[in-house]
Amino acid sequence: MFTIGAHLSISKGFENLGLEALSIDANTAQFFPRSPRGGKAKPLNQADVDGLQELMDNTTMDVILAHAPYIINLASKSEKTRNNAYEIFEDDLKRLDNLPNNMYNFHPGSHVQQGVEKGIELISDSLNKLIREDMKTTILLETMAGKGTEIGRTFEELESIIEKIDMDEKVGVCIDTCHIYDGGYDIVNDLDGVIDEFDSIIGLDRLKAIHLNDSKYGLNSHKDRHEKIGMGKIGIDAITEIINHKKLRDLPFYLETPNDVEGYKEEIDLLRGLYK
């Protein structure tokens, strides 16, 4: 089954998130559990959560993906910034315990001239404190484009974080197609090679989701500018190969393209037609 969704709003609640996803022929959805700029999250409404659970129990929607606020930086040089990131992360994980089958995706962070090794140490230290044995949510490290001092451009950097996690069974990876292409992995001309490299360094069992985005800029550009499907430098042929690849096709895919809800519906219809 092709599991495809898009980044949608929870401003009208979680049940509405599921209903809106189904209305655009999606069977999963990504959302911000709070403002992408941080701040307090709205209190959970149990009836609303129950509505989402019932919807997921009775449809093909099996999993949802929460995306951490962009401001989170567990690798920051500033202790205040790290503490704020930790508090948001911890609160989000506690809230997600109350939601149906879900994962929590985050940008690993930027080391801000401290060096990659120090940044990796700070991230893994925080994750070891955040991860609980009774936690239901799987935490996903996202592949990054390599802007500035971002950590996570290379598979080696992500693996260096994961190998330091005590309860690493609760940690996975989300590949962003725009990010890895901008970061230097040629998924257009050598998708098999990139997948094999990921498998040899991290392991395909860690790959839990894919952000399916075209890229406004070219290979190794380190720009991180998403483009609509088929309108960027990755192109429709490579995207078709990605969604149909035998090692990727059963993963959940999430659109983060520059679109409104109707635009997402058009892309989902297009991709469903290309899925074989």
UniProtKB/Swiss-Prot annotation:
Gene3D superfamilies (alphabetical): Divalent-metal-dependent TIM barrel enzymes
Single GO molecular function: DNA-(apurinic or apyrimidinic site) endonuclease activity
Cofactor binding mode and count: Binds 3 Zn(2+) ions.
Catalytic activity: Endonucleolytic cleavage to 5'-phosphooligonucleotide end-products
Binding site for Zn(2+) 1: H67, H107, E142
GO biological process: base-excision repair
Cofactor section: Zn(2+)
Keywords: DNA damage, DNA repair, Endonuclease, Hydrolase, Metal-binding, Nuclease, Zinc
Positions of Zn(2+) 2 binding: E142, D176, H211, E256
Enzyme class of the recorded protein, top EC level: hydrolase
Listed SMART domains: AP2Ec
InterPro entries associated with the record: AP_endonuc_2, AP_endonuc_F2_Zn_BS, Xyl_isomerase-like_sf, Xyl_isomerase-like_TIM-brl
EC number: 3.1.21.2
Annotated binding of Zn(2+) 3, by residue: H179, D224, H226
Role this protein plays: Endonuclease IV plays a role in DNA repair. It cleaves phosphodiester bonds at apurinic or apyrimidinic (AP) sites, generating a 3'-hydroxyl group and a 5'-terminal sugar phosphate.
Family per similarity comment: Belongs to the AP endonuclease 2 family.
NCBIfam families: nfo
Protein name, per record: Probable endonuclease 4
Gene encoding the protein: nfo
